[in-house]
């Protein structure tokens, strides 16, 4: 499934894109696309719906982030070999984790706010894994069972803040709107992540 949140900022409704590309309203079946909606049992119910019977949404509404009410926005630094080389850094032996503020989450085509004194605004296209089942101390073999789906994320950074004003990743990456995602989440069952070449 391709799940979306559509409508004016702060008034988004849940929806899905059917196989023909038609936007369909899910409001009668789920209040919003949050952690509860992305839990395995809820996703199974949504997958069982006949998309053709859902109300069609006319026009081309704005798409918001395909998930709301997140508890954490976790990212991994230097996660691509080419990016590590580009920055002149070695491949880290352990992943570099950092958090982006939840307020950095925004829709895929929403304006990105440039902070005052910004000098080196940068962006990186990433693939985001949306966790649908609470996960803690999960084995590598079981990890993908906690993923609800995937979407595109634009990891926006202010490199001047990040590298020249204290070396803090949070300072350079957590400004409001610095995490546009979407336009939709594709559920895990429809993505062969091992073939994604990322």
Q: What are these language model-derived features?
A:
Residues 70-197:
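Glycine-enriched loop-and-adjacent helix/strand subsegments that border the catalytic/binding cleft
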């Amino acid at each position: 499934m391709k799940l979306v949140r559509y409508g004016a900022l702060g008034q988004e409704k849940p929806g899905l894109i059917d196989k023909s590309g038609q936007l369909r309203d899910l409001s009668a079946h789920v209040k919003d696309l949050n952690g509860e909606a992305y839990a395995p049992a809820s996703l199974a119910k949504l997958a069982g719906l006949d998309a053709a019977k859902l109300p069609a949404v006319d026009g081309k509404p704005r798409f918001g982030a395909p998930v709301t009410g997140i508890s954490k926005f976790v990212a991994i630094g230097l996660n691509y070999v080419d990016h590590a080389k580009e920055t002149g850094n070695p491949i880290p032996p352990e992943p570099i984790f950092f958090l982006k503020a939840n307020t950095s989450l925004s829709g895929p085509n929403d304006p990105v706010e440039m902070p005052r004194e910004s000098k080196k605004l940068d962006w990186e296209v990433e693939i985001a894994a949306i966790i649908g089942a609470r996960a803690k101390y999960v084995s590598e073999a079981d990890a993908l069972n906690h993923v609800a789906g995937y979407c595109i994320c634009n990891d926006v950074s202010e490199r001047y803040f990040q590298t020249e004003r204290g070396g803090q990743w949070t300072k350079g990456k957590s400004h409001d709107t610095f995490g546009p995602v979407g336009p939709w989440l594709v559920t895990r069952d429809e993505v062969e992540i091992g073939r994604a070449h990322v």
